[in-house]
């Protein structure tokens, strides 16, 4: 229970590990079997949840039933004629393991002194996970994918390799072994009522071996050209070529069935595990045996690791869904009968006929691929874009000599944004076959958290493809105004002898989309989006019926997202590409998902296979020409979001491309990114953001940084170009206030003289935009009288007093330390209507002493230490600027200069304060007081610094001045006790540059403002309401 609570607190989701109770009469029969298989004499983790994970992994391997087929697929060897309902009951019984019986096995199989032994094999190198030492399977696969292959030599043992030495799998490749393991898969044959349709299957293809494929290209091409069928996998009990090539399982459905193919892309090769189609023009009609597919076990990577397990009562995960659009010309139409399967014909190019003459029927098939570890991973397609051949033939980006047909691969991000749809072909001629996309009532669709294939709404694809192909492939497409019209391909450009049946398929790129929801693109925007150059052949004659996925959501452990992260791929760039280099699709978490907050790319350069390829997007629509140099453009990513979620709020940003309709808004955002914002990547800051505006997540400047009635903002540089802002004020030079300022900033900045020097010398802001104002002097800025007052915070820190034309007086304190001396400043007789208050320590627990008292304590302590030990070194911790009063006072008493780094020395020189310049030096060996960064004031850092002094000092007395040290711990400075370790003592002195609670209270009650607006710790309603309560109490006490 504690574990569940901890996970919920950390990851913000409820653990799903606790299994659901089921009827003992239904589930108990298979429980012992599940537990026995989970353990099987091997060590499982001593926690019950780990045993349940292992049981689930075994369950999924033993019962390879896709989620979509769970209630409808039957085993040929056992119950081919069994009903759909029986299949559902059997699946649920096998996959449900009550927690009670699982716990009873704990004492029998737990051996905490034995290292865990994992089942399965690495989907990339094929090393058995049982050989892992000190690694989990997930860890190993992650490293295996990231590390480049060391060898291209195939293992001499081939299929018989049983090595358990990890280095062996680095020394040799194991392509044949991977292929063999992928092929050992249970299948069921088609039902006589299938009408020649193929149904869902679970691919055994485990890994995308891009690097290893090259050594097998010639062999594959030769075997394909000689054999009538394409064989890419081995089957133990499937002697005929027809059986071996089809890797298809029958999906027994109530009314309709779907055709599915399993393909695999390796090194720019698209290999169909469908039928090899002859090059002649004859129809191929091969009978599909009903009971010949073998019922073999499948060997691949474990589906659940020790850190990633779902409820046992949930069905095993279906893998990636594919939608095939099968285009057949008039001559190459699909034929079907009760006993045979329709096959595609092999052509080298599509015969483009007139629309009226031949309207090819596109038969849509919803398919799924089981644990397709590397299938269609776009990082393996490094050169997808190819120009159109000069002989006017439509060329694909792959060498399709070894395929069973010409396949057109939609980019996954493009397909992923389209609505989930099931397409049906229309009957135009009675002699042409028609396949209906089948999806029975009991069949479940799952939108995976990981990469899964897209079901595409064809009208959207149509609108996306028409205009781009008119411009890129002139004469290839003719746009039609309605959804029902069929696009025709020009017959002038292609050879009539090379007509083809082509299949277009798309990947589902939505991980974890909430059930029943689909992320779609605006049709109008898509119609003007240039399509990738490698989409050359379009399906024709399509209608669609949109359907929503069901509520079952499970994890997909495919190799690209084995760790909950989309796989990396190299980004393709075109010459002259704009600032937009990639658009990351961050999916919306589903309520049933685990790791909703873990599946995020850290590196912005890590583009997933769910992204658009930047080289396929038109520069004029996706970027705005900016004034700064190209190198700066390439360093930033401006992420666009145009995803519309049906009935759900987005918890994480969905970044999609929105083109012409929002170009103006994008221009506004990106101009500031270049000219004003500099190198700051605003997307990484956790700052309040507005809703989806202009296709980009634009940060919103909070109201407490705006001065009402003016065009002024205070310390608001990190929010981009603030609408209506005519002058930007900076209170002091601390990074949390000047964040966003850089040398590219081109708006007027008003600050103190010291802060202006720091901006010019440290941030290199152009001097023409820096407007220093004197202290205690009335100045006119854009018609508003402004006065800067000392804030007693750090050098150059100021409070800003605004006198609005309507008589309203506003005081913005910035960061300040209230002091009684302020009561004798220009505020003495001033009525303040609104007070923007620094509320850093607005809580009664912060009752630290005054600065003068702390400085006296530090002086006395340092003087005593140096007097007792002349070789003692005094060290003070500092930030970039601040805490100067402490070390300057100590150095003055000890009669020594303050030694510091060159960088710190330059910073203090910018202050132009004579008293400071006379007491600082970079010669550390000649001074008794040293300055170090605050983060180095610890025993390890100080010990290291002591060694650098070459033995001149044998003791360190360090001061860490910070107000946090004193929070709710001490009431007097005398109570401060040092931390001592050896010859190093560290004093955490309560020297703060922010007001304590009592100082703040005194200042407010003296100033008597009509309204107080807190500027710090305002992130939650609770903290704001608490401070409001304090303000009311202060007002009542003061009687105003």
UniProtKB/Swiss-Prot annotation:
The induction field says: During mitosis. The mRNA encoding this protein contains an internal ribosome entry site (IRES) in its 5'-UTR. This 5'-UTR generally suppresses translation while specifically promoting expression during mitosis, when cap-dependent translation may be impaired.
InterPro entries (alphabetical): DRMBL, Rad18_UBZ4, RibonucZ/Hydroxyglut_hydro
Residue ranges under compositional bias (Basic and acidic residues)?
Answer: 53-65
Activity regulation field: Beta-lactamase activity is inhibited by sulbactam.
* Full protein name: DNA cross-link repair 1A protein
Instruction: Quote the subcellular location field of this record.
Output: Nucleus
Family indicated by similarity: Belongs to the DNA repair metallo-beta-lactamase (DRMBL) family.
Tissue expression: Expressed in brain, heart, kidney, liver, pancreas, placenta and skeletal muscle.
> Where does this protein come from, organism-wise?
Homo sapiens (Human)
Q: Which UniProt keywords apply?
A: Cell cycle, Cell division, DNA damage, DNA repair, Hydrolase, Isopeptide bond, Metal-binding, Mitosis, Nucleus, Phosphoprotein, Ubl conjugation, Zinc, Zinc-finger
